[in-house]
Amino acid sequence: MSDIRKWFMKAHEKGNGSAPKSTSSKAGPVKNAAETAPIKSEQASEDLETADRRKTSKYFGKDKTKVKDEKEVEAIPAKRKLKTESDDLVKPRPRKVTKVVDDDDDDFDVPISRKTRDTTPSKKLKSGSGRGIASKTVDNDDDDDGEDKETPLKSAGRGRGGRAAPGASTGGRGRGGGRGGFMNFGERKDPPHKGEKEVPEGTPDCLAGLTFVISGTLDSLEREEAEDLIKRHGGRITGSVSKKTTYLLCDEDIGGRKSEKAKELGTKFLTEDGLFDIIRSSKPVKKSLPERSNKGTEKICAPPKTSPQKEETRGKPLAKSSPKKVPPAKGKNKIIETSLPWTEKYRPKVPNEIVGNQSLVTQLHNWLSHWHDQFGGTGSKGKGKKLNDAGSKKAVLLSGTPGIGKTTSAKLVSQMLGFQAVEVNASDSRGKANSNIAKGIGGSNANSVKELVNNEAMAANFDRSKHPKTVLIMDEVDGMSAGDRGGVADLIASIKISKIPIICICNDRYSQKLKSLVNYCLPLNYRKPTKQQMAKRLMHIAKAEGLEINEIALEELAERVNGDIRLAVNQLQYMSLSMSVIKYDDIRQRLLSSAKDEDISPFTAVDKLFGYNGGKLRMDERIDLSMSDPDLVPLLIQENYLNYRPSGKDEAKRMDLLARAAESIADGDIINVQIRRYRQWQLSQSCCVASSILPASLLHGSREVLEQGERNFNRFGGWLGKNSTAGKNRRLMEDLHVHVLASRESSAGRETLRVDYLPLLLSRLTSPLQTLPKDEAVSEVVDFMNSYSISQEDFDTILELGKFKGRENPMEGVPPPVKAALTKKYNEMNKTRMVRVADMVQLPGVKKAPKKRIAAMLEPTVDSLRDEDGEPLADNEEGNGSDAEEDSEEATDGEKLESNLKNLNARGIQVELDLKGAGSSGSRKAAGKGRGRGKAADTSAEKKATGRGSGAKRKR
């Protein structure tokens, strides 16, 4: 046993000796043994300590002897008492915690001041070990009772973490383990006593004005739970320590930037138990508990008189409802004003009231105010301005997320400058204007817009004298879909000839629909306002409507609506219908049931599934993320699941999880085949669970790099690129196969050609270029290409398919002059080359035959039917009545083919169509002609017979 362990055990013997109310039968012997035999006392204390480590608070609360001892102490909440009873007999901390709670009941201000004094960092805290803190409480046991009640407040929760099991500490889950060094960077450990402490409830504003920064792993709360607890009670959470930070919330000093910055600025350190005590002390109900128990049943009705906060909150809804009844008596204007939606009622009246983006509003104001000076109604661009200059743009494009004030700013700026705004939004037809306008602008909105920008005609309700200046607002231009065919192109044409300014508004300026429109507009990108800016505006609206809500709750509302201030005002109005005092939890509950739908990319979905909080997502949320793109999300998960390391798992456990995830991905692929091939769409959710949800739930955690130089973010699915390359190679191989079959030099199938023939073809095409002289090598290679009907594209295909990773390029040693001579020689012989396949030349007036059909025709089968003796059948024996039906069609096709072949022969191109069945079909044509045309038929028959006979002879 190490020296620090001996010192720690002796400290607890001293603490047990100073506990006067301990009724345990083992506490006394431990103290006596410490005086007579130190070695035996250490062994006894160690046995008690190890026995205590195997117990938790939920099981240890069943000890009846300790419950009787605790009854001597004044009453406290039952759940809290079970948590404090979970400590060992040798630890006097539970009794001290109960005394501190009683002390808190006497005076509410003491815990705050005491925590600020006791939670300053010390050397023992800096060591990161809970044992040092435990020794501090033992040293204070010798002091008077007042000091004894103050110090254990800090060590109650810290001591439990410090005295955790040794295995837990080495694993990084105890208080002494911490988050480790660089190798554990980015890993957030689970709280060592998660769910074992009762979370207190205080007044809603007990933490108002306090700013907290959370660092490290807390004792029983997750970081998100601690943030919600602080915000629920009016506190503010920031990400870094500054001069405005009140407390650094951490249960151990793990070092790092936050801790060093806090020590440098003198920021006070606060533990989780200290935070609980601050919140618990603000609740005045505990102060009246002893009074009700002592004064009997007559005093039971008294507590409502001692809780003024409830009286105030109950009286405020009445005060809120009374003004609602007053406005009807004040006139019709008030009735109309109260019936308006808040988004219209509190719409900004001047540009300065717009939340955020003031610089863009000023830029829009300057552009619109100088528009007529720049273009002067001439319809042409200003002189002296470059095309890429902002002042040379006749239109402006406002882009940004919905609800951040784009349309409002356009209308307010136009109104302030004296322009009359003509708005055209997605509900209007914005297609291409008619070229011939007979009735002016009547009946067509697109025509009215066209004439408006030309100033050729005006609507009936448009008074030119009163409004000499006009601005056209084209809202939601990225929503021009199939119903507005040609709308974007017509809008660009209108901008070019426009005599009035045009303001275009969209949500996504990077949409493919607006790719050409952006070049003709001045882009102004609106950004989301900060949550502080939105909370300030929402607080103004809440006060005007008589609502009670704190700024922290409004900031949470602003953060949840993703910068959409219109949605935030609507949600605030909905909640005001049922409550006049809105709390932090009310906003969270409201937005949880009516969250705004948003489009997320597959990368964002994978990040959320594999993130630290991926295990906390509900099942419906995981399904929504996986089904956001059911084709791409599983591919991204399969590409990146190996890079994720689950928190708190060793290498063996991680390999087991990887194997289970791979098996689940394979099952998902099998289900996907059933869905795509057999249209079993009822299995889509099963495929989603197997291919996305299960792998992400097994491996969610931190992402690490497996190869040096790799970027630490999710890669795009590599299967898509490989599948595209495989499809391209398959098409090229099909072309090569058809050409080789047409040459009659080989009758191999496509697989045989790829496996057996392709290496030999590659050697015959490249070896002469490397070994023989230039002229001889070029001639040999070109002759070989002609014999197998290999084109220049086929030559490149053979080279591409012959490349393998780790092997050298076949054309590596060929000099550039030889390559140039080969290309030149091949092109020179192109005019006299005999083309043996139909798809290598396009005959005018004849459709190109499908490649698969040509390949089937070129298969090495018997050209014509034969009789029992092996001789070809006669012409009149081959066909039946069906041949007679096809005679007329074949005759016309044959005439066209002959004329086209003559034209090609005149150009010097010799075409030989030596396909399957060519001779027999020609014979049928000749027989049909011979019946009615005499000599001409005989001549044609002789020609066809000659061709057929030669073909048959070659086959024999």
UniProtKB/Swiss-Prot annotation:
**Region described as Disordered:** 1-206, 286-332, 858-956
Question: Is Calcium found in the keyword set?
Answer: no
SMART domains noted in UniProt: AAA (SM00382), BRCT (SM00292)
Phenotype of gene-disrupted mutants: The rfc1-1 EMS mutants show reduced plant growth and organ size, and early flowering. The rfc1-2 T-DNA mutants have normal vegetative growth, but have greatly reduced fertility due to a meiotic defect and produce short seed pods with very few seeds. The rfc1-3 T-DNA mutant is embryonic lethal when homozygous.
Query: Which GO CC terms are listed, alphabetically?
Result: DNA replication factor C complex; nucleus
- Renumbered to this chain, the Basic and acidic residues biased-composition regions fall at 1-15, 50-74, 186-200, 288-298
Quote the biased-composition stretches of kind Gly residues, using this chain's numbering.
158-183
Q: Where is the signal peptide?
A: none
Q: Where is the composition biased (Acidic residues)?
A: 866-892
Give a GO molecular function annotation for the protein: ATP hydrolysis activity
Q: Where in the cell is it found?
A: Nucleus
Keyword terms of this UniProt record: ATP-binding, DNA damage, DNA recombination, DNA repair, DNA replication, DNA-binding, Meiosis, Nucleotide-binding, Nucleus
Q: Can you tell me which residues bind ATP?
A: 399-406
Instruction: Please give the biological process terms from Gene Ontology that the record holds.
Output: DNA damage response; DNA repair; DNA replication; meiotic cell cycle; resolution of meiotic recombination intermediates
Q: Where is the composition biased (Low complexity)?
A: 916-925
Tissue specificity remark: Expressed at high levels in flowers and siliques, and at lower levels in roots, stems and leaves.
Q: Which residues form the BRCT domain?
A: 202-292
Q: Does the keyword Nucleotide-binding apply?
A: yes
The protein's role, per its UniProt record: Plays a role as mediator of transcriptional gene silencing (TGS), DNA replication, DNA repair, hypersensitive response (HR) and telomere length regulation. Is required in meiosis for DNA double-strand break (DSB) repair during meiotic homologous recombination. May participate in the RAD51-mediated recombination intermediate repair process. Is important for lagging strand synthesis. Promotes meiotic recombination via a specific pathway for crossovers (COs) that involves the formation of double Holliday Junction (dHJ) intermediates.
Subunit-level organization: Heterotetramer of subunits RFC2, RFC3, RFC4 and RFC5 that can form a complex with RFC1.
Q: Which family does it belong to?
A: Belongs to the activator 1 large subunit family.
What is the protein name stated in its UniProt record?
Replication factor C subunit 1
